[in-house]
């Protein structure tokens, strides 16, 4: 079987790729199916993967010719992770629409044309919610995105659900909490600070938190996110029924709570490297996101959250070689 990861050069795509190569199979319909080829599609080539099963396709995801290079009749599973992040999609409307919406539709059409109904997993976001939200968002809480990124993700959810209803693909959507702690450098996402205020101080660098200390965030670690992606693709479509979207479990933590966890794990000197200068551009986006949602359905489907944000920090330190 060919497995495709769009956004395969990104940090989550690379972590997923490494896990799939290590496993060597996906359990589909109760049977292990060998991953004979792992195709990574992105605008740049991924680094650090030396495996004969890996095939790299670089190009514009919205180009049908590029998609036809990546998706063929042997493609049994597609992880669609590629996206223009929230802050960038807000700053460049046309780019966000082309990558987050047009490319998603083009991917679905390519799968439809092949006619073999592959499993297709889309990642969505807390950004599909907004406005006046209940303290805990439910699975049936109305979508009301307050950013272009959130709108694009919401439309993608509906498209994948309808392509599944029509039998074109076997789709599933995972609404990811904000992923923290991401490795690497800051990006243009409005939520980038949720990793930076932990990652940079641990590296000896000062970091600013652009939101108020009491701002709540719904968080998930990279390890838990990758495990969720695998569980999501392996779920039988019958278990999802006509509700193809799943709100993943997470941790509800305030910005101040994150720094207190950092203080407990790494000490005062590290935590004191965080400054607090609010930025309206970031707050106007992040402030519309839910602080927590009811994940009972996700838990029943086998998805798991992190035990605590202290453990999230420790896991990041271990992965980054910073553990004491």
Curated annotation (Swiss-Prot):
EC number: 1.1.1.410
Keywords associated with the record: Carbohydrate metabolism, NAD, NADP, Oxidoreductase
Active-site residues annotated for this sequence: 149
Residues annotated to bind NAD(+): 125, 149, 153
Disruption phenotype: Deletion mutant is unable to use D-erythronate as a carbon source.
GO molecular function annotation: oxidoreductase activity
Catalysis performed (reactions): D-erythronate + NAD(+) = 2-dehydro-D-erythronate + NADH + H(+)
Function per UniProt: Catalyzes oxidation of D-erythronate to 2-oxo-tetronate. Can use either NAD(+) or NADP(+) as cosubstrate, with a preference for NAD(+).
The protein's name in its UniProt record: D-erythronate dehydrogenase
Source organism of this protein record: Cupriavidus necator (strain ATCC 17699 / DSM 428 / KCTC 22496 / NCIMB 10442 / H16 / Stanier 337) (Ralstonia eutropha)
Lineage: Bacteria, Pseudomonadati, Pseudomonadota, Betaproteobacteria, Burkholderiales
Gene name tied to this protein: denD
């Amino acid at each position: 079987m060919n497995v495709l990861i769009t956004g395969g050069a990104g940090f989550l795509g690379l972590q997923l790729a490494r896990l799939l190569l290590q496993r060597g199979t996906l359990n589909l319909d109760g049977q292990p199916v060998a991953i004979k080829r792992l195709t990574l599609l992105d605008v740049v080539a991924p680094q650090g993967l030396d495996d004969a099963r890996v095939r790299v396709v670089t190009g514009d995801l919205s180009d049908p010719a590029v998609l036809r290079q990546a998706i063929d009749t042997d493609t049994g599973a597609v992880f669609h992770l590629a996206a223009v992040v929230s802050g960038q999609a807000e700053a460049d409307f046309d780019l966000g629409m082309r990558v987050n919406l047009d490319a998603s539709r083009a991917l679905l059409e390519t799968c439809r044309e092949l006619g073999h109904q592959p499993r297709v997993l889309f990642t969505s976001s807390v950004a599909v919610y907004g406005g006046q939200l209940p303290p805990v968002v439910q699975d049936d809480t109305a979508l009301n995105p307050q950013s272009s990124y959130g709108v694009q993700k919401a439309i993608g959810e509906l498209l994948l659900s309808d392509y599944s209803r029509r039998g074109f693909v076997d789709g599933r959507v995972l609404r990811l909490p904000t992923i923290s702690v991401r490795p690497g450098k800051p990006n243009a996402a409005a939520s980038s600070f949720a990793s930076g205020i932990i990652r940079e101080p641990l590296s000896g660098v000062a970091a600013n938190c652009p939101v108020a200390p009491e701002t709540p965030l719904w968080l998930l670690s990279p390890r838990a996110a990758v495990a969720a992606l695998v569980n999501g693709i392996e779920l039988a479509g019958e278990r999802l029924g006509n509700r193809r979207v799943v709100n993943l479990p997470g941790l509800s933590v305030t910005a101040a709570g994150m720094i207190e966890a950092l203080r407990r794990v790494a000490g005062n000197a590290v935590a004191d490297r965080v400054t607090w200068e609010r930025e309206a551009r970031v707050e106007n986006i992040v402030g519309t996101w839910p602080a927590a949602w009811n994940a009972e359905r996700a838990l029943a489907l086998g998805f798991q959250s992190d035990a605590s944000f202290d453990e999230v920090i420790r896991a990041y330190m271990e992965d980054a070689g910073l553990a004491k």
